[in-house]
């Protein structure tokens, strides 16, 4: 999953690498440089101020360190993403980075990526790695596709068959086309709560998706009484 973000970021960087002295992705609204360089990216001053918007921030790079200003916690989260990119660049720039100022705010309020955990139950560690990459490049919506014909990943109190049946995809028949690997798993309430908190601290909103009435074979296999046509009521082992 992370490779998709990295590939998109690399292609984007080719477009503006020549005009962005800090090579920040996405390109900030305004960048100005001053004389001198700095190797010190420690935050020496930060301040909440009015007027920078929900995700806007300003950053000043000086020989003594970094000064931040933002209006909301989301603005600080975006500033930290920029700082992480600058830290990576500094490790490859022994002479230091140019001193200067960065002012930024997004053109689009919704910058989302989807993870299809319905068709494949990804370990939480992989999802956290994906969130870290999203934050690095300032995406702000994690769309979690939690239910599908091929699996159900959302815990629902009192409906245990969603875990024992709906969350388990068996191996596909040998002669089946478009087969999927066997896969099983359901996230716990605590895991999802922790993920939401982790994302919030990075300026990312979690959008959970539960498909209904279509793409509900995992539900139908678990509780046929919830569906009208139960002839195909099984967790699908093929794509679709």
What are these regions (language model features)?
Residues 1-7, 11, 15-111:
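Acidic, contiguous N-terminal accessory segments
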Residues 67-69, 116-120, 181-183:
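Second-shell loop/turn segments in exported
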Residues 79-80, 125-127, 144-146, 153-158, ...:
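Short, solvent-exposed loop/turn and secondary-structure capping segments
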Residues 108-111, 138-140, 200-204:
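Short, well-ordered coil/turn segments that N-cap beta-strands
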Residues 111-115, 142-144, 206-210:
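Hydrophobic faces of well-ordered beta-strands that scaffold small-molecule active sites
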Residues 116-149:
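A conserved hydrophobic secondary-structure block that centers on an alpha-helix together
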Residues 130, 195, 206:
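Aromatic/hydrophobic pocket-lining residues that form π-stacking "cages" and hydrophobic walls in ligand
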Residues 150-201, 216-240:
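Aromatic- and acidic-residue-enriched carbohydrate-binding clefts of CAZyme catalytic domains
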């Amino acid at each position: 999953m992370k490779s998709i973000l990295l590939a998109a970021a690399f292609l984007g960087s080719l477009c503006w690498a020549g005009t962005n002295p800090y090579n920040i992705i996405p390109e900030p609204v305004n960048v100005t440089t001053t004389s001198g360089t700095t190797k010190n990216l420690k935050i020496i001053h930060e301040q909440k101020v009015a007027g920078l918007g929900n995700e806007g921030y300003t950053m000043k790079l000086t020989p003594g360190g970094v000064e931040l200003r933002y209006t909301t916690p989301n603005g600080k989260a975006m500033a930290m993403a920029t700082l992480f990119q600058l830290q990576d660049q500094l490790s490859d720039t022994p002479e230091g980075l140019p001193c200067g100022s960065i002012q930024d705010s997004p053109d689009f309020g919704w910058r989302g990526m989807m993870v299809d955990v319905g068709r494949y139950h990804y370990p939480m560690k992989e999802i956290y790695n994906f969130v870290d990459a999203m934050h690095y490049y300032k995406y702000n919506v994690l769309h979690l596709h939690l239910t599908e014909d091929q699996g159900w990943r959302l815990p629902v109190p009192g409906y245990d068959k969603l875990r024992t049946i709906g969350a388990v995809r068996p191996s596909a028949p040998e002669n089946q086309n478009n087969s999927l690997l066997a896969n099983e798993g359901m996230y716990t309430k605590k895991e999802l709560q922790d993920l939401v908190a982790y994302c919030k601290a990075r300026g990312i909103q979690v959008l959970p998706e539960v498909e209904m009435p279509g793409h509900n074979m995992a539900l139908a296999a678990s509780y046929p009484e919830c569906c009208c046509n139960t002839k195909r009521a099984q967790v699908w082992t093929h794509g679709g």
